[in-house]
Every structure is written in structure tokens, then in C-alpha cells.
Amino acid sequence: MNLYDVIKKPLITEKTTIEKDSKNVVSFEVDRDANKIEIKEAVEKLFKVEVAEVNTVNVAGKVKRFGRHYGKRSNWKKAYVTLKEGSSVDFFEI
């Protein structure tokens, strides 16, 4: 899998900002077929940082109403990437 296909986008929320500041953990939306090894390699090469560990979560899509009809949002995968001491990623400077 191509490095640019593994990571879709960073997740920037209040929770992820607090984790980034306190635990040096950054969060990404990643491809559903990507494994932890591919995610680690992609983050290290694209952002030039050292990764300590990767945790992943499969997020189920919610059922939503569209007028009278019901539909389902797509399932997706979230990755919590713990960076080693001295490494950091600033999404707004990239």
C-alpha cells in the first residue's frame, strides 16, 4: 500500500489536542485495510518523526436520517500514534 494512501487525514478535536500536549499522542483517520506496521512506517516517513507505538480503533458508521429515508455512514479506522520523546508533529505548520 502506498504511504499516501495509508493516512487519510489528521483528527483534530479537543480530546486529541489534550492527548497531544500531555501524552505526545497524535490521531489520524487511516485506511481501513492498513495495519499497525504500515501506519507506523507511513507516519515516520511522511512526518520524519520516531514512533513508539500505534493503537487502532475500528469505528462503526452511524445510522442517520436523510429526510424520510435512513442511511448509514461509512465505517472507518482511527489510529492513535504515540511518538517517542523529543518527536512532535504540528499539523498547522505542514
Swiss-Prot record:
| SUPFAM superfamilies named in the record | Ribosomal proteins S24e, L23 and L15e (SSF54189)
Q: Which UniProt keywords apply?
A: Ribonucleoprotein, Ribosomal protein, RNA-binding, rRNA-binding
Any one GO cellular component localisation term in the record: cytosolic large ribosomal subunit
Among InterPro entries, the record links this protein to:
Nucleotide-bd_a/b_plait_sf (IPR012677), Ribosomal_uL23-like (IPR013025), Ribosomal_uL23/eL15/eS24_sf (IPR012678), Ribosomal_uL23_CS (IPR001014)
Q: Name one GO biological process term.
A: translation
User: What GO molecular function annotations does the UniProt record carry, in alphabetical order?
Assistant: rRNA binding; structural constituent of ribosome
Q: Write one Pfam family the protein is assigned to.
A: Ribosomal_L23
Task: Spell out the family assignment given in the record's similarity comment.
Answer: Belongs to the universal ribosomal protein uL23 family.
The subunit structure is:
Part of the 50S ribosomal subunit. Contacts protein L29, and trigger factor when it is bound to the ribosome.
* Its job: One of the early assembly proteins it binds 23S rRNA. One of the proteins that surrounds the polypeptide exit tunnel on the outside of the ribosome. Forms the main docking site for trigger factor binding to the ribosome.
Can you name this protein?
Large ribosomal subunit protein uL23
The gene name on file is rplW
